[in-house]
């Protein structure tokens, strides 16, 4: 994958527009989870060190396009950046007709989705973005699967279009995990439905040695293998699909599970062998025997790709399976890459972030890359690099 990289460019005195993914949760006007902002800081700092006049842009939430809404304003993010960078980071609301930024200074543009034509990737808007800068830097992997004005359109028209360090690192890590993975490769794909992860499961079944499934997905595979799953969430119309995937790759199934009579924080957890699951049981986690077996598979892997917790880890009594696997991934010598919102929450809960080789900041983009789909915002950078 050949793209121009920001790290290789001379930015001294240049006007640099950086598209970051600063779409963070905000509560009562304050940023409540700062992971994405923290991930963007090295890129912003590097551009400043290189002597650029830095303009940062992002979306936040889902406002009605073309209309200002206070709840989707990037003001809390500007406040956070000011503290984190130890300098004033003004929020600029009107910037499309030009903005005055000096070399060595940084400003944050107001939510790009307040601009008409952003989501439709309108050329007229993209050209206005491009006219603001000498260099456009795409650093938002989390939005790379969307062709929008500030992710794709601007890259078509900017004088120079490059990948930022965060985007370049994501592409490198995913390329390493999927392109030529160290063997054996184990993937964990968990979630409520096979249907939403079908392309991921099909894609991974062609490259990994073991495919560990969890959550409602595992229940569908269990039912496909003839096991009773009680009143657990599963998809009866996808049993043949599950069997077809299991015929292509080793899918180790749980031998014991943690069940409850209801889906609730107060529910009583009971460990049962898979053969003992009753008609009124709900499977909400893998059992200790299964977790220990899966942990051994992970510890002896060369590459691990993790997407999704294997149980309802938000309730502690159904979190032991995910905790055991998270710790095993952390202890493994494998190159490990993890992505997806719930996965990141599990990594935080069990404190294994430092032990995972690469944590992807993109949810949808991570999955689409794993599926083998083209990411429009990356494709345009490749095209510009060739030109």
UniProtKB/Swiss-Prot annotation:
**Disulfide bridge map:** none
EC identifiers of the protein: 2.7.2.3
Domain of life, per UniProt, equals Bacteria
Q: State where substrate binds.
A: 21-23, 36, 59-62, 113, 146
Task: Name the residues that bind ATP.
Answer: 197, 314, 340-343
Provide a GO CC annotation, any one: cytosol
- Catalysis: reaction(s): (2R)-3-phosphoglycerate + ATP = (2R)-3-phospho-glyceroyl phosphate + ADP
Oligomeric and partner information? Monomer.
Q: What is the protein's given name? A: Phosphoglycerate kinase
Provide the species name.
Pseudomonas savastanoi pv. phaseolicola (strain 1448A / Race 6)
Question: Which gene name does the record give?
Answer: pgk
């Amino acid at each position: 994958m050949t793209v121009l990289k920001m790290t290789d460019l001379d930015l001294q005195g240049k006007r640099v527009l950086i598209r970051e993914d600063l779409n963070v949760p905000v509560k009562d006007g304050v940023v409540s989870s700062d992971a994405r902002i923290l991930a963007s800081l090295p890129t912003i700092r590097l551009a400043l060190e290189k002597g650029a006049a830095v303009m940062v842009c992002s979306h936040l939430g889902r406002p009605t396009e073309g209309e200002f809404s206070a709840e989707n304003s990037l003001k809390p993010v500007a406040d956070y950046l000011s503290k984190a960078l130890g300098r004033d980071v003004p929020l600029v609301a009107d910037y499309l007709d030009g903005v005055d930024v000096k070399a060595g200074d940084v400003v944050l543009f107001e939510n790009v989705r307040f601009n008409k034509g952003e989501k439709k990737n309108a050329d007229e808007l993209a050209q206005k973005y491009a006219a603001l800068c000498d260099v456009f830097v795409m650093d938002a992997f989390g939005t790379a699967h969307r062709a929008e004005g500030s992710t794709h359109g601007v890259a078509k028209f900017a004088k120079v279009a490059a990948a930022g360090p965060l985007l370049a690192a994501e592409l490198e890590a995913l390329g390493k995990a999927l392109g030529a993975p160290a063997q054996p490769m184990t993937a964990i794909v968990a979630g409520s439905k096979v249907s939403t992860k079908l392309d991921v499961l099909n894609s991974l079944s062609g490259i990994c040695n073991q495919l560990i499934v969890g959550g409602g997905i595992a229940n569908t595979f269990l039912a496909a293998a003839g096991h009773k799953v009680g009143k657990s969430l599963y998809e009866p119309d996808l049993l043949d699909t599950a069997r077809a995937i299991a015929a292509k790759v080793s899918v180790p199934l749980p031998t014991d599970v943690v069940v409850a009579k209801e889906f609730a924080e107060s529910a009583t957890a009971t460990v049962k062998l898979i053969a003992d699951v009753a008609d009124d049981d709900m499977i909400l986690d893998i059992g200790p025997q299964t977790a220990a077996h899966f942990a051994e598979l992970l510890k002896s892997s060369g590459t691990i790709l993790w997407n999704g917790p294997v149980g309802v880890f938000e309730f502690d009594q159904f979190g032991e399976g995910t905790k055991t696997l998270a710790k095993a991934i952390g202890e493994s010598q494998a190159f490990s890459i993890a992505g997806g919102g719930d996965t990141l929450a599990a990594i935080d809960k069990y404190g294994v972030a430092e032990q995972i080789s690469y944590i992807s900041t993109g949810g949808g983009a991570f999955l689409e890359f794993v599926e083998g789909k083209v990411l429009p915002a990356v494709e345009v950078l490749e095209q510009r690099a060739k030109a």
